[in-house]
């Protein structure tokens, strides 16, 4: 039996032509990376199983996760004038409440949190699972303690400007009929504004999605999926709260929606069926499904109502001293921080003056722009409080954004988000359509990376060792890194050990084109390499020859026809059928990114 040894060395197209550059990868799992979007804005890309995505997250942003779990959580409490000596006790109570509600959190999200903690800890930072759990459930934990006494929370909200706004507009409301959703997440800016970024996730189950977030969050505050679903949430003070019961929390509920909802009705049913202890308002948009549009979900611990775009305020409630609905269009819905549906407001809820003012102002501005809302107008509308602060609007811009302003184009899967400082530019990202590889039937199925069967042995690669054909030691790598600011290290994960076929499937993160370098070692066997051609929708043979015994370096230049959604796929087939295949265990490459287009 002949054996095939492959060292798989990846040279990524990470220049600026595609609008971003990969600047960091997770050494132990390089599918996770940080991309520089320019202007000081970054995106973190994660993919794989829940634990794998979590580990990549902690590995890449361990310092920031530590800041969020330690300093941000403390700053939230300190921001409400809680004496400093009481904060440690409240944090301890918060962790106990979170732990008591952990059973409501899906196991996959718990695994992702464990991955974050492990990745951050392996990177040398003081983060444990309970820290990450509290960060992700903290909003609901705090409110499950505070809302039952209601009045102080209302005073805090009115004083501190803890508030959010949102809208969904489509059809006649927008300039070309597209579905636009605005989401203003207004919260304590401490720490958050310094570490905020976009997080793009390719989970092994469900839809891919991108969120405007901060390191440490498994849950989402504003996110959009490849199915065209977007979601955000607003606080709403109400007495229908279960003390010390947070359920899975609003952030994780929103994460479940954005990852698994195919259309608006799925989102509604997921929120309705979730375990809740605290009232919230969820705004959901759908730009791709059969139920294209938007809705506001008004929920409390035990009650639930949906305000779709065609909702009309009932006549019987007109005489009541309840907040009234202003928008009366079938292609528009707006939300602030109070219930509109009378049956929900009657649960002893509170509409603070600031929320009423924001709802009236934003709705009025949207109606004034009705029919002409495009991307630029949508950004202007959701950032109408530029900048917000208690007691004034629109004066000093040299302040942190508290915390994000985001516009989603749900028809075209694009987002624009303002975070950091008000003087910063908006970050932009396009979430491409669902990636569905295909081809080479049996060979593909036997080598499909992340769904490998029990006969497969996963191989995790180590340190970079090869640049072109030169063997490099650590000193060489250090020199290369210092000499060239475009230097990157990138690895690839694959699977070996298939007893039926000497085949390996590789999926590369690339831009519009890529140079792939493979170092192979074998005993006079033939090797065929196929790449998926998106122009012909078929596999195209890009290499076929018998190579001599020993190490041979192959270079493949893949044009744009082999790249889709920043992915390129290769299948390698050897003449040798192996029983115990092996892959060379150090399969990374040090490359000059500027030389790759």
Curated annotation (Swiss-Prot):
Bilayer disposition of the protein: Multi-pass membrane protein
Keyword Lipoprotein: no
Cellular compartments annotated: Cell membrane
An example Gene Ontology CC term for this record: plasma membrane
InterPro entries according to UniProt: C45_proenzyme-like, DCD1A/B-like, Peptidase_C45_hydrolase
Residue stretches spanning the membrane: 4-23, 209-231
Keywords: Cell membrane, Membrane, Transmembrane, Transmembrane helix
NCBIfam families, sorted: C45_proenzyme
PANTHER family: PROTEIN DCD1B
Protein name: Uncharacterized protein AF_0267
Organism encoding this protein: Archaeoglobus fulgidus (strain ATCC 49558 / DSM 4304 / JCM 9628 / NBRC 100126 / VC-16)
């Amino acid at each position: 039996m002949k054996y095939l040894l492959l060292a798989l060395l990846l040279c990524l197209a990470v220049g600026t032509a595609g609008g971003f550059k990969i600047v960091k990868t997770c050494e132990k799992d390089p599918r996770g990376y940080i991309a520089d979007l320019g202007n000081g804005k970054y995106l973190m890309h994660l993919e794989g199983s829940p634990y794998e995505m979590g580990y990549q997250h902690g590995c890449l942003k361990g310092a920031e996760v530590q800041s969020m779990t330690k300093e941000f959580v403390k700053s939230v409490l300190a921001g409400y004038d809680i004496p400093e000596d009481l904060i440690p006790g409240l944090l301890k109570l918060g962790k106990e409440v979170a732990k008591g509600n952990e059973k409501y959190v899906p196991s996959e999200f718990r695994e992702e949190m464990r991955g974050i903690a492990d990745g951050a800890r392996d990177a040398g930072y003081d983060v444990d699972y309970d820290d990450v759990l509290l960060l992700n459930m903290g909003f609901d934990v705090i409110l499950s303690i505070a809302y039952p006494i209601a009045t102080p929370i209302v005073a805090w909200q009115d004083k501190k400007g803890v508030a959010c706004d949102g809208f969904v507009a489509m059809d006649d409301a927008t300039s070309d009929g597209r579905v636009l959703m605005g989401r203003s997440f207004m919260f304590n800016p401490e720490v958050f504004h310094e570490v905020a970024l976009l997080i793009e996730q390719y989970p092994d189950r469900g839809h891919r999605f991108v969120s405007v977030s901060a390191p440490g969050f498994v849950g989402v505050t504003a996110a959009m999926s490849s199915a065209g679903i977007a979601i955000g949430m607003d606080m709403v003070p109400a007495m229908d709260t279960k003390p010390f019961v947070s359920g899975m929390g609003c952030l994780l509920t929103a994460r479940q929606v954005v990852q698994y909802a195919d259309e608006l009705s799925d989102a509604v049913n997921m929120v309705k069926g979730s375990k809740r202890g605290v009232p919230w308002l969820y705004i959901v948009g759908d730009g791709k499904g059969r139920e294209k549009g938007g809705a506001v979900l008004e929920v409390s611990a035990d009650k639930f109502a949906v305000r779709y775009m065609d909702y009309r305020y009932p006549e019987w409630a007109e005489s009541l001293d309840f907040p009234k609905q202003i928008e009366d269009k079938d292609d528009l819905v707006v939300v602030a921080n109070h219930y509109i549906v009378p049956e929900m407001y009657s649960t002893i809820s509170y509409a603070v003056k600031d929320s009423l003012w924001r709802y009236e102002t934003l709705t009025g501005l949207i109606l004034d722009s009705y029919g002409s809302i495009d991307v630029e107008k949508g950004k202007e509308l959701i950032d109408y409080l530029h900048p917000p602060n208690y007691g004034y609007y629109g004066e000093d811009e040299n302040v942190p954004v508290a915390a994000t302003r985001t516009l989603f184009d749900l028809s075209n899967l694009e987002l624009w988000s303002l975070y950091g400082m008000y003087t910063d530019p908006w970050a932009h990202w396009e979430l491409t359509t669902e990636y569905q590889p295909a081809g080479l039937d049996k060979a593909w199925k036997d080598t499909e990376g992340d769904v490998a069967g029990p006969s497969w042995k996963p191989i995790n690669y180590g340190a970079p060792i090869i640049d072109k054909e030169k063997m490099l030691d650590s000193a060489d790598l250090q020199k290369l890194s210092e000499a060239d600011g475009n230097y990157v290290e990138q690895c690839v994960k694959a699977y070996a050990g298939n007893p039926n076929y000497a085949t390996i499937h590789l999926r590369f993160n690339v831009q519009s084109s890529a140079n792939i370098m493979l170092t192979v070692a074998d005993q006079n066997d033939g090797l065929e390499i196929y790449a998926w051609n998106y122009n012909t929708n078929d596999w195209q043979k890009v290499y076929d020859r018998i190579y001599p015994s020993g190490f041979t370096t192959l270079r493949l230049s893949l044009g744009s026809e082999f790249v889709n959604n920043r992915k390129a796929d290769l299948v390698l087939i050897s003449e040798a059928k192996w029983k115990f295949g092996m892959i060379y265990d150090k399969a990374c490459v040090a490359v000059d990114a500027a030389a790759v287009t």
